Amino acid sequence: MNPAFEEFDLDEREREVLKLLSSEQNAHFSFQGLRRRLGLHQETLTRTLKRLEEAHVIERSPEGYKLKGTGSIYSFAVQTNQSLAKPIIDAYLPSQVDVTVLFQKLRGRWFSNFRWLGYSHDGSQLSMSWISEDGRMQLQARISSGKITIGADSHTNQTESEQIAAAYQLFDHITKVAEEMVQVASPALVAN
């Protein structure tokens, strides 16, 4: 850690970045996802992330940005009690679907007007998030014990019907990927 970097040295943008990165355990967020979610200009976000990286508070990997380590000497007062996205769809995944492979096929992918935001994994639950191009709505797919829950979190006054429609778009996207996986796992019998 950079000893010259103190918690009180944080500006508002740095606090917002840390708040988002700390919103879920072991979370990784893409640059574009952070930009859309926080509404920052890309140059401003780049400078903010660079300063936090230089202070060894966050780290960048091919999977995105995340808080560095656990039990940091900093006690950033940015932990949120952010409520989980409003659950809209609960469904079970087919037993043939390997969650790791499903995640690999969905990670970084866009659908409709939603862009990849990031993911977190706490051992028992995988959470993947997408954000609308305008940054007004976030969708989240949580997978645990063969069950998938899709929820929406609006950062503005999106109507409930808009949230439901967006959740079903994500569900359709995930369903198509899962169906492809099931077809590959159990190809149709060929008649002679």
Language model features with spans:
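Short amphipathic alpha-helical interface segments
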Residues: 11-27
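Short amphipathic alpha-helical interaction segments
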Residues: 39-54
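Charged, low-complexity intrinsically disordered regulatory/assembly segments
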Residues: 113-192
